[in-house]
Every structure is written in structure tokens, then in C-alpha cells.
Amino acid sequence: MSNQLKDLFERQKEASAGSKQEDNEEVLQFIGFIIGDEEYAIPILNILEIVKPIGYTRVPETPNYVLGVFNLRGNVFPLISLRLKFGLKAEKQNKDTRYLVVRHNDQIAGFFIDRLTEAIRIKQTDIDPVPETLSDNNNLTYGIGKQNDRLVTILRVEEILKKDF
């Protein structure tokens, strides 16, 4: 497990210490990250690893959001730019850029993100569905989580990993 993931777990543990949750309320855990100016999250159970950017190889005839493939300890995985997937312009990587290595069933891929934020705990009752009028890509979004004074868009890993080419 990477040090960043351990740090996120530690911060989450500290934040939850002393806070009283009702026993009958389901609390879901996510990893938060920034793409552009917005905060997104994916379920913590889908995260295998968080790594600093490593080299990747372009693959011809793939959508522009598939940056290519990268080799992580002898395993080759596709690398998906969430910026490009969401229709934002590409940005060069910087010191905050990370790859989230995610899994859904037997599919594994890397998500190229702008910046990691924190481990997030949200009560199921604090997650609202996405209004249908907002986007044609609603299937990518599980819902909008409300945490303190901010909103976090919760993504469906399984939908992002679906091939649309």
C-alpha cells in the first residue's frame, strides 16, 4: 500500500475518532480527488493503489481519453484520463498528479487525476441522485455526496471502465 493511501486512512481514522455515528446509518467510504475545479470520489473498495505518475505507452486507435498503457510491477494496465473523459482540456502532469489504480470485478485500470484530496466518509442518506437534466453522462455518476459545506460527485467505476469504442 502506498504511503499516500496510508496517510489518507490515518487522516480518516483521526477524523472519525470522537464523532458519533448512529448505528443504523450506513456510512460509505470514498477517496476524493480533483479533476479541473471539481472534487470527485470513488468508493475506497475500488482502489488498489495510488501511485505517482510513471511512463506510459500510447496505443493506436483508442479514444483520446485512453492515454495508453502503463507497466506496474510487471502488469500492464490501461491509463484513462478523467479530464479527457469528462470533456475537459488536457493538462500536463505536475507534482500533484497521481494514478488511481482501480478495480471493478476483473477489470483494472489507472485513472489519471489532477490531485488527491482525502478519504471521505459520507452517510448513505447524504448522497442524492444526480438530476437528469445535468448531463447526458449521468451513467458515470452514482450521486452527489454532501459533506460538511461541500458537494462531492461520486463516480461509478464500472461505468468509466466500460468500453465505448
UniProtKB/Swiss-Prot annotation:
Q: What is the name of this protein?
A: Chemotaxis protein CheW
Summary of the function given for this chain in its UniProt record: Plays an essential role in chemotaxis signal transduction system in order to colonize the host stomach.
| Gene (UniProt) | cheW
Of the GO CC terms on this record, one is: cytosol
Q: Which InterPro entries match?
A: CheW, CheW-like_dom_sf, CheW-lke_dom
UniProt record, GO biological process: chemotaxis; signal transduction
The disruption phenotype is: Deletion abolishes swarming.
Q: Which family does it belong to?
A: Belongs to the CheW family.
Q: Which PANTHER family match?
A: CHEMOTAXIS PROTEIN CHEW, CHEMOTAXIS SENSOR HISTIDINE KINASE-RELATED
Q: Which SMART domains match?
A: CheW (SM00260)
Source organism phylogeny: Bacteria, Pseudomonadati, Campylobacterota, Epsilonproteobacteria, Campylobacterales
Q: Which domain of life is it from?
A: Bacteria
